[in-house]
Amino acid sequence: MADLAAGVAERGPRLSLWSSLDQRLVWVVAATALLGLVMVASASISMAEQATGDPFYFFKRQIFFALLGLGMALALLQIPLATWERAGPGLLLGALALLVLVLIPGVGREVNGAVRWIPLGVFNLQVAEVVKVLLALYLAGFLVRRQQQLRTSMAAFLVPVLVSAACAFLLLLQPDFGTALMLMALAVGLLYLAGAPLWRFAALVGVLAAAAAALVVYSPYRWQRVTAFMDPWSDPFNTGFQLTQSLIAIGRGDWLGVGLGGSVQKLFYLPEAHTDFVFSVLAEELGWLGVLAVVLLFSYIVWRAMAVGWQCHRHRLPFAGYLAWAVGLALGLQAFINMGVATGLLPTKGLTLPLFSYGGSSALATGAMVGLLLRCGYELAQARAEGRRPEEAAS
């Protein structure tokens, strides 16, 4: 008993889960989500009234989705990260199974020529959103298991690349080029942060860039999007319609915006105003100051994720470190791509803006990533409470 008591004392006190949460991160995420709800209500009001007779139909559903996302975050917050680390290979198989399942006729639902959703009654599950989370968990576990070989073995370097490429290939069959590109970028980013040799990293980036270019050039649909991106005003009522309407919305907003609810572009001019282009409506109604606020909110979330990841590695919590980095990269990449598309910096991709865009799948996936990030922060705080010193100090 004395030895047991001594061991407990040596490990330090067990922290309360709720009292040790990253309070600033929680408040920033909550503020971002609340602003997102307001913008969904504003951007969808006309479409909802025309489609259902209830101007707040999409807003009410988004509140439900936000609560689902909150529930997902709270549930994952309770689960030790070691559970996910052990389950990595199974999670990967689950991701691949979902990607195959959605392609089976009669299972996946086709919308606008793409088969990306599995009907679940309450909402349609977009498989890519789930795969994004499962792949992040698998990659984090793999990098922990092969951390040393990653710097010396080409096989260890190629496994995460090939796994991500397999997921990307199945996504291209849906087709979902934007998410496929994002998953490959996530894998590349994690390999770089894990310390992969620079020449391998550079070679991989070159190969992926060439592959992406080939997919664009040899696909008339994607090439049309690129040409529309390069000069949207040459065909503003056809191929360049989405981008020109988005740019008009952003231009109308100027510095202070036209006021909440005052957007004209959401009145059936701007397609997907409450989903893919909710950022454009925000820019029109809240102006560049609103845009700056959103950019700062996302910048803080990403910065915090990367900082937590770095501290986890210093305190010898490698799985938590890689997972926090994966969450930061995933949220940051998706937000950057969505904003880049809306402002004309990138070709149209069809990716949602986390915490803003309407949709149950996006809310669940974002909630899962936030819950996992908060769990990483909790286990870091627990390691500090147990007296575990950073590597520099320990040496």
UniProtKB/Swiss-Prot annotation:
Pfam families for the chain: FTSW_RODA_SPOVE (PF01098)
Signal peptide: none
Entry GO CC: cell division site; plasma membrane
EC number: 2.4.99.28
Cytoplasmic compartment segments: 1-24, 84-86, 138-152, 200, 298-316, 374-395
Pathway: Cell wall biogenesis; peptidoglycan biosynthesis
Keywords: Cell cycle, Cell division, Cell inner membrane, Cell membrane, Cell shape, Cell wall biogenesis/degradation, Glycosyltransferase, Membrane, Peptidoglycan synthesis, Transferase, Transmembrane, Transmembrane helix
Record InterPro entries: Cell_cycle_FtsW-rel_CS (IPR018365), FtsW (IPR013437), FtsW/RodA (IPR001182)
Record keyword Thylakoid present: no
Domain of life according to the entry: Bacteria
Enzyme class: transferase
Membrane topology: Multi-pass membrane protein
Topology Periplasmic: residue spans: 46-62, 108-116, 174-178, 222-276, 338-352
Subcellular localization(s) per the UniProt record: Cell inner membrane
Any single biological process term in GO: peptidoglycan biosynthetic process
Spans through the membrane: 25-45, 63-83, 87-107, 117-137, 153-173, 179-199, 201-221, 277-297, 317-337, 353-373
MF GO annotations: lipid-linked peptidoglycan transporter activity; peptidoglycan glycosyltransferase activity
Catalysis performed (reactions): [GlcNAc-(1->4)-Mur2Ac(oyl-L-Ala-gamma-D-Glu-L-Lys-D-Ala-D-Ala)](n)-di-trans,octa-cis-undecaprenyl diphosphate + beta-D-GlcNAc-(1->4)-Mur2Ac(oyl-L-Ala-gamma-D-Glu-L-Lys-D-Ala-D-Ala)-di-trans,octa-cis-undecaprenyl diphosphate = [GlcNAc-(1->4)-Mur2Ac(oyl-L-Ala-gamma-D-Glu-L-Lys-D-Ala-D-Ala)](n+1)-di-trans,octa-cis-undecaprenyl diphosphate + di-trans,octa-cis-undecaprenyl diphosphate + H(+)
Entry function: Peptidoglycan polymerase that is essential for cell division.
Family: Belongs to the SEDS family. FtsW subfamily.
NCBIfam families found in the cross-reference section: ftsW (TIGR02614)
PANTHER family (alphabetical): CELL CYCLE PROTEIN, PEPTIDOGLYCAN GLYCOSYLTRANSFERASE FTSW-RELATED
Official protein name in the record: Probable peptidoglycan glycosyltransferase FtsW
Organism of derivation: Halorhodospira halophila (strain DSM 244 / SL1) (Ectothiorhodospira halophila (strain DSM 244 / SL1))
Gene for this chain: ftsW
